[in-house]
Amino acid sequence: MSRAAPFTVLIPARLASTRLPNKPLADIAGLPMVVHVARRASQSGAQRCVVAADDARIVQACQAHGVQALLTRADHASGSDRLAEACELLGLAGEDIVVNVQGDEPLIDPRLIDAVAALLHARGDASMGTAAHAIDSAEDFANPNVVKVVLDAQGLAHYFSRAPIPHARDHGPGSLWWQPGQTGVPVGFAPLRHIGIYSYRAGFLRRFPQLPAAPTEQLEALEQLRALWHGHRIAVHVTGSAPGAGVDTPADLERVRTLLGG
């Protein structure tokens, strides 16, 4: 696909992590992980890639490798709050497009970043954009750690859930009603796994943390449900391939080190 129209990549990076302390600074092939993320993101069509950090050590590590970084407050409740502050610090206009790339995604595909940014340039009615891909196993469909998304006819998110959605009434009870090759389902149906990358209009991103939390958001522990609850539209890019693995645990880190030669 062609390059997206202008946008900024923001990479939230938080030093505290219960499962992997100092995660943004974890060494991978001689570079901090967050620098790998920024370098991958810079291969997209973004005008600039900026790390929004909660600790001066992250800022220093980024600057040592030529990566732009901002020091944000350490007490933000979520990554969205951190990004909202970054928008203010950068002086982004309300209609400017921002793509949130997680700081633990050193294998992020730059083409996916472009695609998610392009959603908002193409869809003036959407406040957010994100991505999904087809689930290919019954285990993933049933796994609550695999977030599912159902789309409407316009490619907008209808709902996100940790539950296996949609549920097929006529296939009986249980979470494993679907499996690859399942018969008796509508033509073209495939359950979709949500990919945790987002694009926003900067004005909406600044307002988002002030929106009251949604009951569905609190039940599912999925922040994007707040946007749907308050009537905002989320456009979804369906990609044909699964994203590169993120880094949440020491085992994940070792796997990525092997892939990147570290």
Swiss-Prot record:
Part of which pathway? Nucleotide-sugar biosynthesis; CMP-3-deoxy-D-manno-octulosonate biosynthesis; CMP-3-deoxy-D-manno-octulosonate from 3-deoxy-D-manno-octulosonate and CTP: step 1/1; Bacterial outer membrane biogenesis; lipopolysaccharide biosynthesis
Per the record, its GO cellular-component terms are: cytosol
Q: Which Pfam families match?
A: CTP_transf_3
Gene3D superfamilies assigned: Spore Coat Polysaccharide Biosynthesis Protein SpsA, Chain A
InterPro entries linked: Cytidylyl_trans (IPR003329), KdsB (IPR004528), Nucleotide-diphossugar_trans (IPR029044)
Organism's domain of life? Answer: Bacteria
Q: From the record, give the cysteines joined by S-S bonds.
A: none
User: Family, per the entry?
Assistant: Belongs to the KdsB family.
Q: What is this protein called?
A: 3-deoxy-manno-octulosonate cytidylyltransferase
Organism listed in the record: Acidovorax ebreus (strain TPSY) (Diaphorobacter sp. (strain TPSY))
- Lineage, highest ranks first: Bacteria, Pseudomonadati, Pseudomonadota, Betaproteobacteria, Burkholderiales
Encoding gene per record: kdsB
